[in-house]
């Protein structure tokens, strides 16, 4: 039966993806046998697998297999050539435990095949079984016996082509990840292929490889367990998902698999980001609203935009400028007519006086201009010899400024060069963050006649059509420092540039850096935020933005958003209005548009301005919550924006939900994603759900429920789940002003009468985020036995250095979902046993919602955030 299963897998591969079965590199699968197995003193497993004889297909004869349980929840299986070193992601780029030595002096194979060996340390839920003849391996879950990864016999390992297939349980596996692609579904569809090769392709194109490569997926299986799988490789690849199998086809490197036990989605991302690096902490101001456009005319144009946002009373935190500001599109220069230092510097200074920020774009290509010794960046780059090479000379590309050289960020001096250029430029224009674009790397030159690296034996499905991998990028034969070819390093460039940029900003400012990168790889979240690239002003792109946002949360990149109102093409008033209602709840919220398209600043249409004020007004109230979620992301990898199954993994109905999302565990966003409707269909998992705009109980369900909600043109549905305590502040036009307002606590009761939450506070831009810096953590708890008796809200100050030295107060507590037969005649309020005024003039009142639960507003409070308190509310009838 095993042989039949393998034949069926191969048949499915050819039926559903014939292109993947036509490569000249593919041929008879090599049967391998384990020749030797050893267990190291550290408990790792080492083995050698070899083919039965000389292969006519170029298979590597001897493979070294290394397997180790690196933590109780993380298993590594690495397969490489036993006799020759091969490219793999360098340790200094993604620090990780080094594998053990390979077996070079294994004993010859015996006539009787070795039995399968098992790696199953006590305390771990992961079990590895290595099968001897033919060689294959299986990863299973000890607690359930469920098989997580089961490779088919016939692993292929050639110099430029590696292939391995794993069976999956048909009907039970739900896969997410394997990016970056614009997909119409967050859950991966059966019989689909996923190409990973960083490319300058517009995000408006569906089902093609885009700017980043993340060979990681999460598998959520009924009834609610989850695990993760990473193939750590920077080489180009196709991954084919057929529902009952997943096949990797990689054009180089090694097979370096990591398996993460979970057993729930939050645990998987915790384990994954523990390996690849935790997400970078973002400055508080970056959670404000951002405005950008490719095509701003001059500094006066920027000034008008800022002034009109203020006049319209729409929050604006950060003003951005695209490549328009440059002199001939050259990095670290200013246009000599429209964006002179004499005009731009005072504009930036005025932004700063108003507690607003300024961000500029950089592209990696440095203009080749040897006759112009005044372009200092080029001159210094040549002096330090840090550019990418070809045949011993600098590789010439072509982008916006014309011919360019690209910094080689694998060169040990390149990061220092980049940091110095940032510092020199900031002396003229003190930008607050940097946006790095075109770093796939994008290259406008048409491919030259191809060689073996341009067109390897297996052609991945680049651009959805199998284009050569040199299309619109640096040629794979270009050489990085140390002799590494672009063929191997290609997918790492954006990560390396983000690392150099972030470190440069940190060194120059001493503050927490904000970097936004278009190209990403495994671990990029350690250095950069991300946006979904060049989307289009269409309703489809509005919908797809949720899928990409949720996928990047899995990849350890929680600070993500899409260009609000769409980048390419002309938007419409209705689309822009609905987009800001969604975009106000992206972790990264920015309006951006392309040159020669209609402008789309939010104030241009009265209806969009109204939607913006309402949605962004709520976002700014939620800033303490967003920032607390950023702290959670930095400490545990938990996404800010999450799919519903993160909180409800046992509810199978949530597995396919991708038109709604959660912020943290408590806030549910259900936007309108089509033109015309004034209602939206939403799914509510089991529990109580309260409207965040008016605090009323909207849905109470024990099993999960689909509900049609009213969604008038100026409103997005946002709900708070029962059991949550949510700290809010008041809305303002900047985050700085919002931070100076008093806190409110929303206490949304669960069915059992409990609720909890927490608040993280610091100065908003200290580099030592939540560790050695000045910070505070406060936990809030609520419990009322059987929904009867006095109400008690308690705070617990876990860490207090920040709040203790500042006057931060909670002026109001709102209790939502209190069951009461009638409105109480009187509310008596005690704080730490002392009675306080509870009059209507102080803002205390009770809103009776009948059987759906009442809302008690307790106002006039001065609860000090940095001091523990107990708030007790008694109701007299």
Curated annotation (Swiss-Prot):
GO biological process terms, semicolon-separated: polysaccharide catabolic process
Signal peptide: 1-23
Source species: Hordeum vulgare (Barley)
Ranges where the record places region Disordered: 89-115
Catalytic activity: Hydrolysis of terminal, non-reducing (1->4)-linked alpha-D-glucose residues with release of alpha-D-glucose
Organ and tissue specificity: High levels seen in the aleurone and scutellum after germination, while low levels are found in developing seeds.
Keywords: Glycoprotein, Glycosidase, Hydrolase, Signal
The protein's name in its UniProt record: Alpha-glucosidase
